[in-house]
Amino acid sequence: MQLYTYLYLLVPLVTFHLILGTGTLDHGDALTERRSTDATALKPEPVLLQKSSARSTNDNGKDTQMKRILKKRGNKARGEEELAEKAPEFARELAN
């Protein structure tokens, strides 16, 4: 009876020791290699952040392009040239 009790307790301990100690499962697949390849396969590729040429910001993250545009326009909401260019479009929209 004592032999069966020792085997009952010993077999799971030996099994877990072999699995965790050697890092292998059945068919000799290594746990550590599989995890590392799976982890690298799931990692997204690094995205290179580039500042858009349309927007430029200062060190505080404020939009400096809008500042320049407003300064050039004289702090008007829209430039006179821009209104003159879009006048036919506005007229068409109002007519519809």
Curated annotation (Swiss-Prot):
Cofactor note: Divalent cations stabilize the toxin the in alpha-helix conformation.
Keywords noted in UniProt: Amidation, Calcium, Gamma-carboxyglutamic acid, Hydroxylation, Ion channel impairing toxin, Ionotropic glutamate receptor inhibitor, Magnesium, Metal-binding, Neurotoxin, Postsynaptic neurotoxin, Secreted, Signal, Toxin
Cofactor: Ca(2+); Mg(2+)
Basic and acidic residues compositional bias, start-end: 77-96
Modified positions (4-carboxyglutamate) in chain numbering: 81-82, 85, 89, 93
Chain positions listed as propeptide in the UniProt record: 22-78
Signal peptide annotation: 1-21
Any one Gene Ontology cellular component term annotated for this protein: host cell postsynaptic membrane
GO MF terms, alphabetically ordered: ion channel regulator activity; metal ion binding; toxin activity
Tissue expression notes: Expressed by the venom duct.
Effect of residue 83 to Y: No change in activity
Phenotype upon changing residue 93 to K: No change in activity
UniProt site positions, description: Important for selectivity: 86
Post-translational modification: Hydroxylation of Pro-88 is important for NR2B/GRIN2B NMDA receptor selectivity. Removal of hydroxylation does not change global NMDA receptor antagonism (tested on WT neurons), but it decreases the inhibitory potency on NR2B/GRIN2B NMDA receptors and increases the inhibitory potency on NR2A/GRIN2A NMDA receptors. Hydroxylation of Pro-88 locally disrupts a small region of the divalent cation-induced alpha-helix but does not destabilize the entire helix.
Binding site for a divalent metal cation: 81, 85, 89, 93
Source organism, top-level taxon: Eukaryota
Family membership: Belongs to the conotoxin B superfamily.
Protein name: Conantokin Rl-B
Organism: Conus rolani (Cone snail)
Organismal lineage: Eukaryota, Metazoa, Spiralia, Lophotrochozoa, Mollusca
